[in-house]
């Protein structure tokens, strides 16, 4: 029972009522401490503000000084540039008439973006911007919607080899295995494989095979009195005078052959089971006597181009090359001319060919390639009666008859080789100074390699070539293996081994072809049976393009 609530009490009683003694008492000492603490805090904040203000003033002063210095230096630079521009303008006005200045500037700007090459003397020039061969392939396929073309038995065999692999078949867009035509993808990757053969995939490969060969030829040509060589010579000058140099070289080769027929050998004595082109003995040296039997090495030693190849014993009685490096530079002809030709490109990093022997070997192979072309291309006139079915209009349908001229016609003085060097090799090298034999002449690679493969030669069982010996053959195409390894992204060493296998076939094919009395007939027969080549006109374009399309009826 609840208690009775009184009438004067509230319904809800407050909780926690304040105590009567709950009061805050601050003494005077406490108030003084609080006041001092506040004063110190305010003084600290004021000092911090003054410090930041001083730092900002100092930074502004330093920036003003820096700005004034930069303006002064920029004014000096502008003044110097203005003086240089005025001097160049005065010099150009002395050299170029004012009426021709505009056209010369236009030509120089165009030369930076467009390169012009000419293959034969009866055709107009061809312009390209970056990559000559891919642009030709693209142009050809853009203009062939109404026709079907065949490229020869070799490309058709490539198509059949890849057609059985479903993955590669999709990648290369192969259809209709019975059709002789091939896709743009297959042609492009095949030509790309041909272009890579003499490009060695090394990060420290400073000199192309073409440049190495030109250095060797320059040193050889310098051994004759009364030559045109000066210390201002460039690679372009050597290329334009290759015909004259090869006349001297041909005389030496024939003299060596007549004196000792067994010395007429253009090959290398590699040890058995050698897989890679790069030398592995003592740094960058090949095995002993690798160069001993090569006729060009014997000629170079005879003419004093090189004193002795390290590790070889074929030049007894000569001092070793190391002793020559301590003497005057002009005593070593090869090193002297190599430095003159390569110094604008490499500076002081010019390699010594007899010590980094991959340059010596690749240069010799490049000389053999150009020498073979010199023997073949001037065998007949380009203006003779044609038997082939390929014309430039196959790639460029809109070529007019007026574009085909015969202004350089000469019935006695045939200069197909000289014309090709001047109007194709020179502008291509100027556009890309890393050009090699395979990038210049992929067609030559395919013919020579197929000649070596046809003979059944095997680099792993390398012996001196015997003309009276027959070799068994296999159906293996080294290009099929190389292209497949690239498409399937095989390990780098495996791809390199297949690449070098083709390179060794190319070396052996050159040895076999140059050893023949009439190399032209052998190469033309091979090109005719595999690549649709019927005459010299076809052969010239096949050397450069790597393919000859001929219209076919389905």
Curated annotation (Swiss-Prot):
<keyword id="KW-0945">Host-virus interaction</keyword>
<comment type="subunit">
    <text>Heterodimerizes with CVC1. Interacts with major capsid protein/MCP and triplex capsid protein 1/TRX1 at the pentamer vertices. Interacts with the large tegument protein/LTP.</text>
</comment>
<dbReference type="GO" id="GO:0046718">
    <property type="term" value="P:symbiont entry into host cell"/>
</dbReference>
<comment type="function">
    <text>Capsid vertex-specific component that plays a role during viral DNA encapsidation, assuring correct genome cleavage and presumably stabilizing capsids that contain full-length viral genomes. Participates in the interaction between the capsid and the tegument through interaction with the large tegument protein/LTP.</text>
</comment>
<dbReference type="InterPro" id="IPR002493">
    <property type="entry name" value="Herpes_UL25"/>
</dbReference>
<dbReference type="GO" id="GO:0019072">
    <property type="term" value="P:viral genome packaging"/>
</dbReference>
<dbReference type="GO" id="GO:0019028">
    <property type="term" value="C:viral capsid"/>
</dbReference>
<keyword id="KW-1163">Viral penetration into host nucleus</keyword>
<keyword id="KW-0167">Capsid protein</keyword>
<feature type="region of interest" description="Interaction with major capsid protein/MCP">
    <location>
        <begin position="1"/>
        <end position="46"/>
    </location>
</feature>
<keyword id="KW-1048">Host nucleus</keyword>
<keyword id="KW-1188">Viral release from host cell</keyword>
<dbReference type="GO" id="GO:0042025">
    <property type="term" value="C:host cell nucleus"/>
</dbReference>
<dbReference type="Pfam" id="PF01499">
    <property type="entry name" value="Herpes_UL25"/>
</dbReference>
<dbReference type="GO" id="GO:0075732">
    <property type="term" value="P:viral penetration into host nucleus"/>
</dbReference>
<comment type="similarity">
    <text>Belongs to the herpesviridae CVC2 protein family.</text>
</comment>
<keyword id="KW-0231">Viral genome packaging</keyword>
<protein>
    <recommendedName>
        <fullName>Capsid vertex component 2</fullName>
    </recommendedName>
</protein>
<dbReference type="GO" id="GO:0043657">
    <property type="term" value="C:host cell"/>
</dbReference>
<keyword id="KW-1160">Virus entry into host cell</keyword>
<keyword id="KW-0946">Virion</keyword>
């Amino acid at each position: 029972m609840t208690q009775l609530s009184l009438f004067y009490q509230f319904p809800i009683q407050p909780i926690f009522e304040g105590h009567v003694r709950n009061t805050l008492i601050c003494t005077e000492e406490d108030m003084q401490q609080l006041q001092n603490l506040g004063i110190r805090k305010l003084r600290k904040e004021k000092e911090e503000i003054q410090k930041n203000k001083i730092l900002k003033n100092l930074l502004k002063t330093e920036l003003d000084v820096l700005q004034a210095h930069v303006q002064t230096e920029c004014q000096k630079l502008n003044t110097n540039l203005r003086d240089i521009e005025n001097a160049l303008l005065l010099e150009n006005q002395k050299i170029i008439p004012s009426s021709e200045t505009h056209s010369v500037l236009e030509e120089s700007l165009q030369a930076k973006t467009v390169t012009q090459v000419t293959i034969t003397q009866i055709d107009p020039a061809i312009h390209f911007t970056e990559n000559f061969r891919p642009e030709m392939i693209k142009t050809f396929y853009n203009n062939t919607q109404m026709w079907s073309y065949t490229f020869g038995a070799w490309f058709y065999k490539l198509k059949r080899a890849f057609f059985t692999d479903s993955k590669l078949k999709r990648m290369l867009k192969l259809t209709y295995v019975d059709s002789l035509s091939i896709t743009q993808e297959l042609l492009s990757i095949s030509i790309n494989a041909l272009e890579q053969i003499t490009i060695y995939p090394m990060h420290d490969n400073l000199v192309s095979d073409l440049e190495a060969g030109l250095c060797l030829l320059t040193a050889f040509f310098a051994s004759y009195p009364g030559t045109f060589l000066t210390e201002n010579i460039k690679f372009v000058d050597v290329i334009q005078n290759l015909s004259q140099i090869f006349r001297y070289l041909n005389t030496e080769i024939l003299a060596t052959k007549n004196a000792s027929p067994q010395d007429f050998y253009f090959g290398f004595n590699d040890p058995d089971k050698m897989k890679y082109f790069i030398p592995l003995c003592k740094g960058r040296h090949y095995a002993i006597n690798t160069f001993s039997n090569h006729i060009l090495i014997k000629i170079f030693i005879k003419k004093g181009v090189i004193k002795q190849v390290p590790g070889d014993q074929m030049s007894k009685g000569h001092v070793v090359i190391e002793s020559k490096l301590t003497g005057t530079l002009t005593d070593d002809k090869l090193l002297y001319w190599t430095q003159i030709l390569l110094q604008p490109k490499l500076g002081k990093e010019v390699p010594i060919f007899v010590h980094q022997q991959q340059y010596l070997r690749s240069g010799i192979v490049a000389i053999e390639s150009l020498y073979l072309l010199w023997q073949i291309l001037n065998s007949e006139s380009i203006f003779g009666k044609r038997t082939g079915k390929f014309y430039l209009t196959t790639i460029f349908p809109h070529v007019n008859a007026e574009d085909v001229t015969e202004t350089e016609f000469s019935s006695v003085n045939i200069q197909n080789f000289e014309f090709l060097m001047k109007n194709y090799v020179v502008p291509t090298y100027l556009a890309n100074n890393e050009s090699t034999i395979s990038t210049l002449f992929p067609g030559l690679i395919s013919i020579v390699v197929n000649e070596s493969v046809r003979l059944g030669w095997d680099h792993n069982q390398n012996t001196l070539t015997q003309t009276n010996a027959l070799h068994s053959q296999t159906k293996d195409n080294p290009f099929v293996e190389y292209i497949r390894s690239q498409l399937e992204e095989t390990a780098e060493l495996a791809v390199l081994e297949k690449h070098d296998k083709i390179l060794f076939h190319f070396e052996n094919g050159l040895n076999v072809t140059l050893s023949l009395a009439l190399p032209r007939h052998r190469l033309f027969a091979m090109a005719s049976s595999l690549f649709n080549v019927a005459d010299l006109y076809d052969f010239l374009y096949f050397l450069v393009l790597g393919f000859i399309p001929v219209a076919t009826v389905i």
